[in-house]
Amino acid sequence: MKSRGLVVVGILATITLVLTSCQALYLPNQPNVPLMSEGDELQVGMSVGSTGYGAQLAYSPYYHWAITANGNTFSVNNGGSFSTNRSFQHLYGEAGTGFYTRVNKYLRFEALAGFGSGYSFDTLTKRLYRKLYFQPTFGYSGPVFDFGFTPRLSHVLNYRNKVNDVPQTMNNAAMFLEPCLTARVGYEQFKFQIQGGLSFPLGGTNFTYRNRFISMGFHLTFVKDFEKYK
């Protein structure tokens, strides 16, 4: 059993290494998929993957209303992991809100929309972009296992570049379809999480992008009680 776990970790690490070897303006982030069940519910997640290190936060002030925030940071350093000489850096953050409901005891539906902003930076050029997104999710949430399918739509606008600190106004926009699978396994309050998805441009693009993403990490849920799962 232990050897199987090591094999899985090794495979995921290899995939992540391959994906992160490609530098691009737009690195699609893993969506925030809370699969909430009640009001006054708080969820926190941390992950590592093809877009670097990520953090996710979700809160429901009232039943049917969710507020989310998440971000990612990723960099490639010349001279090793502890070097300050960065050849590439990517930073992105977003916030969203929307509707969710319990279809029945375990099935969930949620529809979130939001805004994000980020940049990609190499030794010469800093490329800034904004994103508007809409993400419906169809999922299952239980005491041991969670699963969700999220066909996200993202509108990405590369609005400015800085070449040697000289700003250049840009207007490069593209729409992406980004289907993603989310799986979590563990206990009621603590679960391990893995997410993976693809990114397809709906038309032409005038900037570079990564066409897939994967991450793994953990997910915490804080609620008044867990009677909803029983």
Question: What is the meaning of each model-derived region?
Answer:
Residues 7, 48-49, 218:
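Short hydrophobic/aromatic segments of transmembrane alpha-helices and their interfaces
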Residues 10-16, 52-54, 78-86:
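Intrinsically disordered, low-complexity coil segments
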Residues 38-40, 51, 91, 132, ...:
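Residues that act as N-cap/strand-start positions at coil-to-secondary-structure junctions
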Residues 22-81, 223:
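Short glycine/proline- and aromatic-enriched beta-strand/turn motifs that initiate or cap beta-hairpins
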Residues 1-30, 225-230:
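Cleavable N-terminal export/targeting peptides
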Residues 59, 64-155:
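Gram-negative (and chloroplast) outer-membrane scaffold detector with strong preference
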Residues 116-230:
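Outer-membrane beta-barrel transmembrane domain signature
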Residues 36-44, 53, 63-65, 105-111, ...:
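Outer-envelope beta-barrel architecture signal
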